[in-house]
């Protein structure tokens, strides 16, 4: 076996970096002057070419990520194309340095350019941050595509025509003569009647760039070109942007490891991708007035308020009286996050583990790790519970493990069996959840599970589940509200019935 020396490896990396640097001059970069931008809308085909500070890097990236998450959460509960969505999203966009609606465009070109620049930079930063796993790539591509689709549908035809001037593929608007020559074919293929078609705007593009429309059967094909109406232009542009994104992120991933910015840039990129799914930290600190959780309450809590991942590990612990390291860490930090004290956590694990091993062996082999998670050993830093992103993207389970995310790490049939064991979900609800998991929409699958388990309508929760402890907290809120409502109805005085005069 031949090993490459450290010096040779360093030289290899330098050679690759030199090659990348030499290629940069052939890459077209985004405009750096206000007069150069073709229109404030863009399809993100040219990366930014100016320098920014780390402070601006953080500010722009986090602003865009928060906006995309707000967009996703709202889209999950309100139809994307109705007025309610527009009104609610407009309020969420207040103060955002990005043109989302046409009437937000400033009067001065310099101001437009600054917003355009932040739009461009934010998009490409997130590309870098989310290029390292297929799940992250797919999430960003989908949400950026939906966001662009929403923005394009707000615009007039003239604005979209201006945006077409800045695309890197050929797309042409049909002239009057060409349109009239094939008007009957266009009517038939695009399902317009005789009076509608002459007043419609049509475009043509290489058929390879219209696969989505061809699949739907809504285009006219002729000599390698696809002809389609203006109504489908947005589909073409969004599909092209998403394809470009996926290809670009795959290339970025190959070069990310040899960047000279490891000390400053890569930690920031990791933070962005991790924060895409996680909200607040669950470190076990409970607000005043919270219910004290004890080990004797866990069985009942697991049945009604645990996410499937935690319920799976809890049941495994009760049946097998043991958890492997990955499950002990994932489940242990979750229990810490819901407020289980260190003493209660040790007592709970000892009760189960000592059904197979001695108490001394438990103390020697497992007690230290529990105390470590609570910040009482080692570095003495209290650890926080794992978010869904951490569970999904790190330390995937083997066939004999019980940790991980059931929606991500279970085969479809196995997942359906697990969901069926709850005996609460209906068959069609299980199918719905399994379909979302198969589409890699794990957060939506878990959210639907939550809603069905709590007798809510789809979208009734009003947010996406992105953390097992969030699942627990939201469940406990609903349970508390329903108990309070029941008590209130029982305490209400019975209506007084007047005695009727029968005389």
From Swiss-Prot:
Q: Provide the binding site for [4Fe-4S] cluster.
A: 309, 388, 405, 446
Q: Which GO terms describe its biological process?
A: DNA replication initiation; DNA replication, synthesis of primer
Instruction: Report the cofactor remark.
Output: Binds 1 [4Fe-4S] cluster.
Q: Which Pfam families match?
A: DNA_primase_lrg
Q: Name one GO molecular function term.
A: metal ion binding
Look up the record and report any one GO term of the cellular component aspect: alpha DNA polymerase:primase complex
Subunit-structure text? Heterodimer of a small subunit and a large subunit.
Q: What is the similarity comment for this entry?
A: Belongs to the eukaryotic-type primase large subunit family.
What is this protein for, i.e. what is its function? DNA primase is the polymerase that synthesizes small RNA primers for the Okazaki fragments made during discontinuous DNA replication.
> What is the name attached to this protein's record?
DNA primase large subunit
> To which species is this protein native?
Caenorhabditis elegans
Lineage of origin: Eukaryota, Metazoa, Ecdysozoa, Nematoda, Chromadorea
């Amino acid at each position: 076996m031949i090993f490459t020396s450290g010096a040779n490896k360093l030289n290899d990396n330098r050679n690759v970096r030199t090659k990348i640097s030499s290629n940069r001059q052939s890459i077209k970069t985004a405009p750096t002057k206000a007069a150069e931008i073709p229109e404030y809308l863009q399809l993100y085909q040219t990366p930014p070419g100016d320098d920014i500070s780390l402070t601006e890097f953080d500010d722009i990236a986090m602003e865009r990520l928060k906006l995309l998450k707000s967009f996703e959460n709202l889209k999950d509960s309100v139809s994307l194309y109705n007025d309610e969505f527009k009104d609610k999203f407009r309020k969420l966009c207040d103060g955002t340095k990005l043109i989302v609606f046409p009437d937000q465009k400033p009067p001065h070109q310099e101001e437009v350019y600054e917003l355009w620049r932040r739009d461009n930079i934010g998009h490409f930063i997130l590309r870098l941050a989310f290029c390292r796993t297929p799940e992250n790539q797919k999430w960003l591509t989908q949400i950026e595509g939906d966001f662009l689709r929403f923005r394009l549908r707000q615009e007039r035809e003239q604005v979209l025509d201006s945006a077409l001037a800045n695309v890197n593929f050929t797309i042409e608007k049909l002239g009057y003569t060409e349109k009239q020559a094939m008007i009957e074919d266009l009517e038939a293929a695009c399902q317009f009647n005789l009076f509608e078609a002459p007043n419609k705007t049509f475009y043509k593009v290489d058929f390879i760039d219209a696969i989505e429309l061809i699949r739907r059967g809504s285009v006219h094909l002729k000599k390698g070109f696809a002809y389609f109406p203006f109504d489908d232009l947005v589909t073409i542009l969004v599909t092209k942007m998403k394809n470009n994104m996926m290809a670009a992120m795959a290339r970025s991933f190959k070069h990310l490891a040899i960047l000279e910015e490891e000390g400053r840039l890569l930690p920031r990129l990791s933070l962005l991708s991790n924060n895409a799914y996680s909200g607040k930290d669950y470190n076990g600190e409970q607000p005043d007035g919270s219910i004290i959780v004890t080990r004797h309450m866990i069985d009942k809590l697991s049945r009604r308020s645990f996410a499937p991942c935690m319920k799976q590990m809890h049941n495994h612990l009760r049946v097998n009286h043991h958890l492997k390291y990955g499950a002990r860490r994932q489940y242990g930090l979750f229990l810490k996050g819901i407020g289980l004290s260190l003493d209660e956590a040790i007592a709970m694990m000892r009760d189960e583990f000592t059904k197979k091993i001695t108490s001394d062996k438990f103390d020697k082999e497992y007690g230290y790790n529990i105390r470590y998670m609570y910040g009482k050993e080692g570095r003495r830093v209290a650890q926080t519970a794992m978010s869904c992103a951490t569970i999904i993207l790190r330390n995937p389970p083997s066939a004999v493990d019980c940790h991980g995310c059931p929606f991500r790490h279970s085969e479809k049939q196995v997942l359906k069996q697990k969901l069926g064991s709850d005996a609460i979900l209906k068959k069609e609800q299980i199918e719905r959840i399994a379909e979302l998991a198969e589409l890699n929409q794990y957060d939506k699958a878990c959210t639907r599970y939550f809603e069905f388990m709590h007798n809510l309508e789809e979208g009734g929760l009003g947010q996406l589940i992105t953390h097992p402890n969030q699942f627990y907290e939201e469940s406990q809120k609903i349970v508390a509200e329903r108990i309070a409502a029941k008590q209130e109805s029982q305490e209400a005085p019975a209506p007084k019935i007047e005695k009727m005069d029968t005389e």
